[in-house]
Amino acid sequence: MTHHAGDLSRRHLSRRHVLAWTTSAAAVAATATVATVMAACTGGEGPDSDEEAGVARLDVVDSTGALLDFDGLREIQSNGAGEDGWDDQLLDPDTLEVLVHAPLYEDDESSAAVDLPDGGAATLTMSWPTSHGYSALLADIPGPGRYSLAELAARALHERQQSRLDAVDSVDSAASAEVRALRDDAAAALAACSAASDPAQRAARGAEALEAAAGAQLALDEACQALAPADAVIGVTFTQPPDTAQISQAVGIGDGQRQMAARIVVDDASDPGEMDAWRQTITALHAAGALALVQVCDSQTMTSFNAHAWDERVAALVAGLPEADAWEVGNELGGSWLGDDAVDKTLRAARAVRDDPATAATIVVVTLYYQLGQESAENSVLTWARDELPSELLDVTDVLGLSVYPQLHPLGTGADRVLSALAEAFPDQRVALTELGYGAEDLDSGPWWFGSQQDTASARTATARHLTSAALGRERSWGAPFWWYYLQDEKPGAPGGPVGDVLSDVATGSQDQ
């Protein structure tokens, strides 16, 4: 039976709220390159004891410039959600794989401290705000000592921006000039950090530097839409068969300048009526020059299929929708709710697609569930992908995508670094943003925000514009953002309003230059 939007939304209520908060720690010895960071021990304390213990002390301040204690740091990190919002991890600076889970602890001298594995460099990630909203903070800690946390994060952003900015400059000098001006502000703020007289002043100046560097990063991410490959698609998701008007509206997003793609989410593959409706949808998409991406199974329902039922579903989809251009054989892999057989099911689906002559040459997509620290160390996205994706599956996978829900798992200024790490880890696949949503009723309990804390429409627009631009604007991008609630959000009067216009803006702005 064809599902309704309300039914699907209720099913996703449990899926999107799965946050396996854990307090267990896992440490892995790792070798990392020490970053060039201007940071000094202060207050008359020598670095020797910290160096021997591998301790990095971290300072943050409140809006008045007063140093915060550990509880104050946790309050900001979680946006008032308490322990459920404690999402810190120490990562390998190059791969962003987890070194230590939940490393932050209370310290008598500073706001917080971490023990660095082998006393070496590591990257601390946690949710942290600027005026733009919450991001996945990525603060490169060069070694033991005392630091302004915000300054470390600002330097990590600033030092990684130049190569991307040079690439933008070659195709859009006006956009690059705007980013350069913002970077000049960040550079001045970082220079001021080095002249601070005490930890509180340095942390306050670090906060100013992070604000400036974050603004430059977000502007750079949007400017990078000019770098999008000519064949990268602008995507939406159909969670039910659309009518003719909805299809026409959706395919218009590309505005004739970038190919549009629609992911179709099949509820009951054994329902002849629903399958016929999806065949008509694919025909209409093709007539308009758009692509059809079939989702084999939404992650929320994967565990409801035993091995036999799974194979039957996949066979019915492949036989019933052979005209599809691409197949998402695994959705939100790495999610802790998927069960132990998720990878095996995904591999069997990929084999079925590759083995059928009608679909053998189509694009095979695997979507990973993005989160860095909100769940266990094992489920952190890059750790999970490196450890759990078998070579046999990778050999038949063309695209690795991310599913991102910023209210549950902030990304923000961390987007470029995370996407770059994914691309570097899997050089044989193209990368994509294959699921994105913000502001839906079943996401509102997420403690974090981006774009605007009060105005859902502004927040949704900011999220769609930023992450679509960041995902499209890279050499091996396949597409973005495959907005999950597209049909619901485009309805007149929908809370938070539509996303079609902002996606069209990005598609037009990302015209290959």
Residue ranges and their predicted role:
Residues 13-19:
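N-terminal export leaders
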Residues 52-86, 116-187, 191:
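Amphipathic, heptad-repeat alpha-helical segments
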Residues 432, 436, 449-511:
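Substrate-binding cleft of secreted/luminal carbohydrate-active enzymes
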Residues 192-245:
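Long amphipathic alpha-helical scaffold segments
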Residues 34-51:
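C-terminal region of N-terminal signal peptides and the immediate post-cleavage residues
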Residues 1-13, 24-38:
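N-terminal secretory signal peptides
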Residues 73-113, 122, 229-309, 322, ...:
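N-terminal substrate-binding region of glycoside hydrolase catalytic domains
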Residues 243, 272-276, 301-395, 404-419, ...:
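Active-site cleft segment of glycoside hydrolase catalytic domains centered on the general acid/base Glu
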